Amino acid sequence: MDIVSIYRNLWGLIDGGFFLLAAALFFSGAFFAPIVVEKQIRPLLWYPLWIWKAIRRHVDPGAPFLRLWGLIFSLNSLSLFCNLVSGLFIVFPPLFAFLLGVHIAVICLKEVGNLRLFPLILNPVSLLELPAAWISLSLGMSLGREVYLRGYTIALSLFWRELTGYLFLVLPLLAVAALVEVSLIKALGNRPMANSGLGGGSGWE
């Protein structure tokens, strides 16, 4: 079996309906973020601001290229793996999709003072990371559906198949996205983008 056939089979793991649902929930969360900031809803502000401060503190634009790449890739890989595993808890993937939009938009609002939708989704890093995030969430939703309909025993057998999709679809997208992001950080001297560690996309600072 050639590589094209392998990837054609892998794409078959993605439920298109769940992929679109993940994207819709993400944007719903992003549009809800201004209310979160305006009303100072602390339970929804704490995590994105905490992790963003931690990333800014530990990511030095002057650090070696591979070190920056490894850090950004590792953080996003862990975040998106959690999206997949969350399917074992049925309702978590849709919740995570919504919160991902909230978290990234909150950081954008705090950093630049407004929510710029087009830079949020139409920059080189976002064009790679957002689909990766939605794929991981759709895999988690598929897993959650199996848990609900057939129970954990059947769902766990599906998990290993879904994990293949994560390894061969999600991780390559994240690897290239981290490469692009670090290249931009080095070229422009910027801090990391608001997507780092959250598994989604954002506008440049």
Where is each model-derived feature located?
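Alpha-helical transmembrane segments of helical membrane proteins, especially in multi-pass transport
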Residues: I121-R145, A177
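Interfacial helix-start motif at the membrane-water boundary
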Residues: R56-S86
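Transmembrane alpha-helix/helix-exit interface in multi-pass inner-membrane proteins
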Residues: I35-R42, N83-V106
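Residue-level signal for the membrane-embedded core of alpha-helical transmembrane segments
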Residues: A23, F92-L95, P131-S138, L167, ...
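Membrane-interface interhelical connector segments
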Residues: K39-A63, R67, I104, C108-K110, ...
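Alpha-helical transmembrane segments of multipass membrane proteins
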Residues: L25, G29-A33, A132, L173, ...
